[in-house]
Structure formats: structure tokens, C-alpha cells
Amino acid sequence: EDLEKRANYEILNDWEGEIERSGMFRRYILRFRYGLYDTINIHIDCSMEKTLLDPDINELANDYYVAKIKVMKREEILAEKVRAIYTRHKGRDLYDLYILAVILKSKISVGLIHEKFKSYKIEERYSFASFERKVEELRRYWADLKSLVGNFESLDFDKIKEEVLDVFRNA
């Protein structure tokens, strides 16, 4: 049976031709319509850079096959997000860190954060005091999440900031 008819979806873009490239980074965006009205975008971000930790192997399964995918360990993703907070101004980095550190309780390794900074040649050294300042600087970029998160109105910057800082304070 034809999968598109059975699942009632339609791919809306040439996702293989619309790859975003930047250095050692690739983003694949798949846009499809599911049902009559729902349009869904799926972003698949791929880093071609070597990870500091060996990747985990996750399985992605459907009715037809199982794919084994190498994924960065959560602990390293968390270190990447700390690095991102030091090098750019995006509210989503704090949100992602909140999910990783507070909700998922991913391990925080200060040593790994230092290694990550070194691998990106970031001269500023991680410390809780500098991290606290960097997190506060994201306040003015918090509204950028509106278009990314469906429940944005329920996300209180101060509450999320404090919960993230509490976890890092005790790391």
C-alpha cells in the first residue's frame, strides 16, 4: 500500500535540495502536510565535527525498517549549549539548557564545558559567575522563542533562569 495515501501526508519541499550549510554544519528541513491542514517542519541538524565523547547509538524505527543513528551524548549537548550561551544571543539556548539540565537532569560536567570551550578556541573561561551574567543577557532575546515554542506564554524567563542557575550552582 502507498505510504503517502495510508498516512495521509504530503511532502511540501525539495528537502534534499534545500540543505543549509555553514562550515561543518548541515541542517535538513523537511516540510510536510499531515491531514488536511496541519503543516509540520522537521529540522535535522548535523554537525560534521568530531565530538569529544563517543556518540550514543539510537534506533529510529517505523513499520518498514530500523535505522541506527549516532547522536551526541546529552552531557555533550549540554556543554554545547553552555558554549552557545557564551558565543551568541539566542533565547532558545537557555530554553534548551532548561530542558536538558532541569527537565531531563542531564549530567553537568564542568570539565567537559572547559574542553568544549577549548575546542572552539573560546578565550573566556567558564565560571558560574560569568555563566550567570551570560544567562541574564538572554532576557532581551527571550521573546524570540514565541515562533518556536507553542506554550511560550507559560514560559517565565525568571523562573527558568533561576531553575537553570540552581542546577549549575550545585554542579
Please tell me what each predicted stretch does.
Residues E1-A171:
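Structured mid-to-C-terminal alpha-helical surface segments
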